[in-house]
Amino acid sequence: MSPRTAAGVDPTVPAPVVELVGLAAYTELAEFGLLAARSVDAPDLATRQALADGADRALARQRALFALVSADDGVVPGVVGAAVMEPFDDVLADFDARTRTDAWAEGLLKGVVGHGVAQDFCRIVAGGLDGSRGRAVRKVLERPAPGPEAGADAGADAEAIWLLARMAAADEVLASRLALWGRRVVGEALGMVTVLLGRRPELVVLGAEAAARLGADLPAGRETEGAVRSWLVARLTGEHTRRMDRMRLAA
């Protein structure tokens, strides 16, 4: 059964919107899990609370995404969410397997970098959505710059970025180790994006639309997928570099 025809999903919502909402909501769920886990064994109470706040914000953003595709028919929201996320249930499995770590700071950076790439992908590809629903999706996915007092609209990883920046500034050895780890993680994350595009042709179409609206001149026909992939990887790499800069880590 297609997520678009599942119980509780508004049948008037275009299929590309349901597709992207499902992926974006799944990345928020993954971000929640990572931040909540890191909160449990955080080094101090303030850090524990900051990461818990970020985890809570991930679920709030996920609920906002579900609301964009939900029909007002009494179906439990969690059922709707599971239906639209189901096609992406294993999308992070290989990435997680390749980036296992027991180190607390490296685990936190894995979420910031890896899940950050996935969330950037959703935000960029959302540029290919038409109409008012497309604008609504983009509004949910847009994120203000992180800081020590991230607002309610900031990304779930805002506190994590700020915490890692403080840790890197205080310990040059740790900063070097995290920079090296970040390079490995982003490589795996970009590989994940490539696999995802190969599995979900709808996302390639959205990526092509987003690129065209930003003035990119991509070839048509059989070369489109490769061109879209290259364009997206370049954009995602730029976003990753800026994210690492905010953490005072070399990309």
Q: Over which residues does each language-model region extend?
A:
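Internal, conserved structured core segments that host functional sites
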Residues: 89-155
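Conserved alpha-helical segments that form or flank metal/cofactor-binding pockets of metalloenzymes
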Residues: 55-88
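Alpha-helical scaffold segments that form or flank carboxylate-/histidine-based iron centers
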Residues: 16-21, 45-60, 107, 132-149, ...
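Helix-loop segments that flank and shape redox-cofactor active sites
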Residues: 31-52, 115-132
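Acidic/His metal-coordination segments adjacent to aromatic residues that form catalytic metal sites
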Residues: 2-22, 86-111
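C-terminal accessory extensions/subdomains outside the catalytic/core fold
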Residues: 193-251
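N-terminal capping/interface segment
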Residues: 1-29, 41-46, 67-78
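A contiguous pocket-lining binding segment that forms or flanks enzyme active sites
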Residues: 125-194
